[in-house]
Amino acid sequence: MAYKPQYSQYDLTFDASAGVEPNFHGMFVQGDSLYCISRDDSRMDMVNIIDISTGKHSEKRLDSTASYYRTGTGFAGFKSKKLTIYDENFDKTGEVDLSKFIAELNASGESLLIYNGSNITMDTEGNIGIVSNMNTLYMVDANGVLLSRTECPDNMSRIEMVFVTNAGSWYIVCGGMNYGDTVFYPVDIKSGTLGDGMEDILYGDNNTVVDICPVDEDDFYIFSRNYVYRYISESATSEELCCLRDYGVEIDSQGMGVGSGFGMFTDNMPGIINYTGSQTEGDADVRNIELVTFVKTEGKAAQRTELVAATISEPSFKEREAVMRFNKYNPDYYITFKTYLDEDYHTDDRKEKVRLARQSF
């Protein structure tokens, strides 16, 4: 059994008559909809909601500007010592005042530094996990009171994200001293203590984790830059769904400074949303959105032949872009790069590897 990416295209149309192009500040997948947060010169954010069954989209004006996060109950927006809580339809349901918590940090010589979209999340009981400066996890209750703090383990270089499963199990994802080394740690949110690290969840290359999507009770999908995995809690093992680049899927393309968005559909399958381009049509500014979903395939339907491109250095953007298009649409073949640029390049062994790679290509 394997999973093959399936692509759908959607357009968002904005009024460009005032000469202001809205920027994207968040993209999410949730239920049967895609959510794109846009911001124009009004300094008010707008959530654009695309119904994937009809392709139609609606808009909701939000209270102000903020940084947005997907949580266990819907979404949250953080700004000015306040966390605004939204449900799965992006309707406001409440606020959490974090001013006392932040004042407590400042009094002790600390500060709250939040770097990316996976650094705040919330469980169904209102407990909030916040990763600050990529090295400390703060747990705060629904009233903004500090519950516990957890430092990054000494043998790891950073905390990349915090997440909570549907059953209420909390984890942090830590990056190791070497690029691509990733360890998952369970967290006791009352005491702040960590359980034993899980080191063998990811395998393959380019496996920096970019997002986690909980499913069922304690299972979760893992998006790395090159693979999608599912962690199976019952057996404490993971399975690879597919290699994204083999199918031409680029993660975190930074199309409008927002990268990619992730989330779960109602059928418990993960999805990826990407901004792919734009064009102006009269007074309309049209933004192109691509949705990637995953379809189960069996037997020969899941098999394609690998073509290896031997390169002396990393491929250029144009070369990689062309290969990604090929991998996305070719039903029989896909291309991978094998780079041989190192101090041993001129050895006979390295020359032979290059020759074999070029021959296979």
Model-found features: residue ranges?
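Recurrent small/Gly-Pro-centered beta-turn motifs in extracellular repeat architectures
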Residues: 37-39, 79, 132-133, 173-176, ...
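Short, well-ordered beta-strand elements
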Residues: 303-315, 333-340
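Pocket-flanking alpha-helical
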Residues: 344-361
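Short loop/turn segments that connect beta-strands within the blades of beta-propeller domains
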Residues: 30, 43, 71, 79-81, ...
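Surface-exposed loop/turn elements that mediate protein-protein interactions on large endomembrane-trafficking
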Residues: 2-19, 42-62, 82-109, 135-154, ...
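Repeated scaffold domains used in trafficking and secretory/extracellular systems
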Residues: 19-30, 61-73, 102-122, 154-167, ...
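Short, polar/charged alpha-helical segment
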Residues: 315-334
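Conserved beta-propeller blade signature
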Residues: 35, 74-76, 127-129, 170-172, ...
